[in-house]
Amino acid sequence: MIKKTILLLIFSVILTSCVPYKQLEELGIINTRGVDVTENNRVETTIIAYQFDAQNPQITTSTTGVGKTIKGARENAGYNTNFELSPGQIRLELYGKETAEEGILEYLSTLVRDARVSDTMLVAISNITANEVLTVGQEELNTDVGQIIQSLIEKEVKEYSIPKTSLQHFLHIEADIGQDPVAPIIGLRNNKPAIVGIGAFSNDRLVGELHIDQAFLINTFLTNVKGTPMEISLPREPFVDFIFNNETNSMQPDKLEDKEHLTILVRISKGKGDITLKNIDDLHFEANVHLEVDLYESSELLSVKNKKIAAILEEEIEKEFKRQYDVLLAKLQEIDSDPLGFGGIYRTKKKGERLTDTEWREKYPNITVDFNVNVDLMHYGTIQ
Amino acid sequence: MRKRMKRSSKNVFPLKIDELEQLMKSEFDKSPDLSFSKYEHQNKKIAVFFIPYQVQPDRVENLLLTPLLESKEEWSNTAILNKIPLNSGKEYQQMDEILPGLIAGKVMIYIEDEAAVVSYDFLNKEKRSLEGAETESVVIGPKIAFTESLVTNLNVIRWNIRTPDLAIEEITIGKRAPREVRLIYLKSLANDTDVDTMRQRLNELDVDNVEDSNVLMQYIEDDSASIFPQFHTTELPDRTSYAILKGKIAVLMENSPSALIAPSTFFSFFESTEDLYMRWNSGSPLRFIRFMSMFISVVLTPMYVAAVTFHYEIIPTQLLISIGQSRAGVPFPPVFEALFLELMIELLREAGARLPTKVGQTIGIVGGVVVGTAAVQAGITSNILIIFITISALASFTAPSYQMGTSIRLLRFPMIVLAGILGLIGIMFGLCMLIIHLLKMTSLGRPYLSPIYPIRFEDLNKALYRLPQNFQYKRFISLSLKDSIRFSKRNAKEKKDIDE
Amino acid sequence: MEINVKIKPNMRIQAFYLFFIIVSMQIGVGILGVPRLVFSEAKQDSWISILVAAAYVIIVLLAMLLILKQYDNADIHGIHRDIFGKWLGKIFSTVYILYFAIAFYSVLLTYIEVVKVFVFPDVSNFVMGLLLISLTIYGVLGGLRVIIGVSFVFGVLANWILFLLIHPALQIDFNHYLPLFQAPFVDLLKGARATSYTFMGFEILFLVYPFIQNKNKVRISSLLAVTWSSLLVLSATMLAIGFFSAEQLERREWAVLVLFKTQSFPFVERFDYIVVAELMMVVVPSLLFLMWGLTYSMKRVYKVKQKLTLYVAAIIFLIGTFFFEKHFETQRVINFAEQFGFWFIYVYPFVLLPLVLLKKRLKKRKGAGSS
């Protein structure tokens, strides 16, 4: 028994002298980090961190630091704060536009190398510099701007309006041959942060900016979308007979001349797109998109009384989506970014040599795609 | 005979009454309690001696002295034994039987020149009446608890298990101050090896005295270095009879209000008879909650310490902010904070146990609410930790066995220290050590972690959860009983269609 | 040294536990790194490699069982003694002991490195070694019965980690498995060879066989064990291939651990930390069996008391943890263990089998001649 106790004592003495403490309240816990490249290839990082100080009720602070590497910049930022900045809780990584255009892989891979960094953090880019978004936002809102941007993105991801943009997703898609990642673009609207678009990458370089609605189109090919609200403009022409005229209290069309479009709001309750390679030599693809939509709102009193009008509505929505997809593809081919993953499909069908990135970059602008959109109008709400 | 030098074993009879008086007075010279009265009856000298407070005086007078002295009979030992209508008459010749007999409430009668003393049993044992259980309180089911009187306890057990199959063996242990111990089991059920082991351990026990059955347990358990109790001690007769009927062995001890049950497994300590009285589908979750709370009680506070000291990454951001804010002003590292609070809880519990019930409750409120709030406001502890500590303290009190509950509560301290030194790795090290320890333990030579290891799938149904009675037609297989079938399995109900 | 081992009845174990013995020996730290190793050889056809490897393991296992069946109740040391005689047999048995030592050392170092990379970069090898070795000593002191209990209980308790893989499994990109059948045959074999370190461990059968009570169940139990471990390795590899892109997977040292990084719950943000800690429950049984194999073999071959070997070996290993701090040094130990084990576990039984059969036939003939 005595032997055991002595052993235990020696044991605990050795143990106590081993792992340095990293107590929560002595750390500055980085929540959001912005990265910009300044002149002379120096990295400027803007850090929003939590620090818990009994004297100071304000728990978020922002600091900036400049350095040659991102870790160096963090060290540099550390001189401004009395807490040790630590990266284990980074939830959002924001890259300035110029930085993203030069490529962000080097920054991302430093993140991955550190096992303590979370893989689920969000990756976003800003249309100005990251520093500006974070500091202006912070001053304007006087709360944790990082949190706000995160919830903005998370909300949209939950609605499937934009594709998932966690670090793991971004890296995985970036590293896949024949597919390119996208990331939301955060800008300032009335000096408040907002999602202003979606950035298309070619490998790890930002090459173009897409409209936020186009993000949904991309997302249908990446995942099964559910419950996404969406505004669609349809030509008014086919519906004139079915628009209820409030003034005349009849189905007579109103004055036509000033209106060309009818805008409806739908909720896409289910959506799924898949790509098949029709002809491997011509690089001809077929992309089928199936959407189930519920009608929520329309800009005019549209009365959906019978099957016929529903069919017209479906057809017009299909047409509109097809047009949008064609526009999207043209734009993507122009900037040589392939977020829909045509290259991935091509790779799985290609025999022999493995597909290389450069090979696909050459082929991509020449591919042709037939988009077939199939819309099922499921519900119309409580009124007809 | 006289040559035998050992005083207590010499046979002194026959002798004169006065000689006997001298002898008895010298034996009891330091405690002048012996009542020694001499009577002349039909020309014979009769001495009646006893210790007054050990006997019931009016019964002695009515049942023994009156018939003895008012009769015209010429008394001899045989005449007394034959004529006096009492059933406990015995003859003693040796001093080492007479002296303990006096202490055990016997009245001795000696007729001059006879070769032996006649004794009758008039024990007057002061005892409290049967009361409800205090430490192991139950909501439904029988509530009486054992008392300090062995006879009463045996009476209760006998009345619970009304079969001649019940064996109650008597063993006396303790050299200086002997105590009676009873080994109770069902002859047709209990495993012979287990009974032999238990009997042997009791017989071979070579100690001066044993204070209580909880002490007895420590003398005879398998591994005295372990923190876990290896035999179950309970104050519920209900529970004891349940265990005996399951084929286990119980040990009752004079002057001890708790019974030992052996062999016990780790899981049996979390078993309450209430689980039986509840229906199976409400009993099983309750037992599951007890297992869960044991785990929570051991792991929750260490997890907090580990997360706050080393692994802030695993805390979700929102929780991190509130933990961080509450930790902000605390001047100690989390380990000391946690140890301090755990110590406070232990203080409260200990004070509550010592103080009278009503004061104890007040102390609980003062300690828990007032000191807790003040500690948080003074900034020496964080309020989130107080929540964790309270939950784990509560959880540790759910164990139906007080001994096991205490073991689990004490286990937290080394776990907290390990968590404070090596974080999650330390906790896992502690858990691994604990499980290996449990695997190494035995109770009466049977694996402590049974029926998990060695695995007995049929026993899981009783040890970990309960199924409807129809599924419990077997007794514990791991106990290797003589008869492991409780009842023949009822035939499956005929399958009926709807509306038939 | 007798060829056949007499085991007291209370030391006997059921063949049922053989499943847990073999699984806990096979599934250890090896499975964490195996996806990368196989993938870098066989690419998306890794599953074929693993199936090939599993089939080969089953063949080896059947050969081992055939060898053991030729004797009443012998273990590998008794067989060595019988086939090679006193001195040569001792040499072969010593190689076996060395193998246990090296395997123990490699498992120890790998787990320490995982902890250092994922949880505590600053922890010293010595402290981690002290923890694991004290667990080993404590467990081995309990004897084979307790060690098997540990492998059983820990084996059951550690399984909940598998549920954490559901989340990454839902994010699999099935295109990563396509196109099928691209890897040349040589690469497939290379991929199969890369799993050898992971699949090691079933050789413990050579030692525990005499302890088993119901010998008729040995075959089914051990085959199920090997199948289950192969399934685990296969699904871990497939998950990693589906989850990571090729480029990522080739660079991730412990891809399986990274899979856990994406799972989060409202009360726990990061599960990889908990999984690394929980891995101790996976590693300790292997350590216990390897240490037990070492001490028991020493007793069988050299008649050294098990306790003595245990304490001496523990001290040597503890000192040994000082010397391999760097990643590539650890890798060298693992590679050495792998090379060593490959010839010894996967090839050697096929050398032994004909010798045993030959010897038996000779004996029979002799027996027939004399009678």
Residue ranges of model-derived segments:
Chain B
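Membrane-embedded alpha-helical signal segments
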Residues: M1-V299, I314-T317, L438-E500
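Membrane-interfacial loop-to-transmembrane-helix junctions in polytopic alpha-helical membrane proteins
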Residues: M278, S282-P285, S326, G352, ...
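Short aromatic-rich membrane-water interface segments that cap or initiate transmembrane helices
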Residues: G283, I321-P333
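Generic detector of multi-pass transmembrane helix bundles and their immediately adjacent loops
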Residues: M303-A306, P316-L319, P331-E500
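Functional cleft and adjacent loop/helix regions within the main domain
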Residues: H311
